[in-house]
Amino acid sequence: MGENFNRHLGSKLRMRRLALGLTQTKVAQAINVTFQQIQKYEKGTNGISSLRIMQLANFLKVPVIYFFEDYPAYNSP
């Protein structure tokens, strides 16, 4: 689950960032990481901690659940 989940989170991050017209650098500055770290998040190379998910959700103006929606394991009984 880990690798697929990381890719899912990264995909959701990238979709929202692009929808808002933000650069990786702007997002990185907002949560105090490097733009390279945002790249790794978006590719699913690195996992995203719960603290970072909360920071990202706040900055990207989405509920935390946004990152988990559409993930198969989340929707199963």
Where are these regions (language model features)?
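A detector for short, charged/polar N-terminal pre-domain segments
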Residues: 1-8
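A generic secondary-structure micro-motif detector
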Residues: 3, 42-43
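DNA-binding alpha-helical recognition surfaces that contact promoter or target DNA
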Residues: 11, 15, 29, 40, ...
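Short basic helix-loop element that most often maps to the first helix and adjoining turn
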Residues: 11-26, 55
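Short alpha-helical DNA-recognition segment
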Residues: 21-40
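DNA major-groove recognition helix of helix-turn-helix/homeodomain DNA-binding modules
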Residues: 51-66
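Short, charged recognition helix plus adjacent turn
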Residues: 68-77
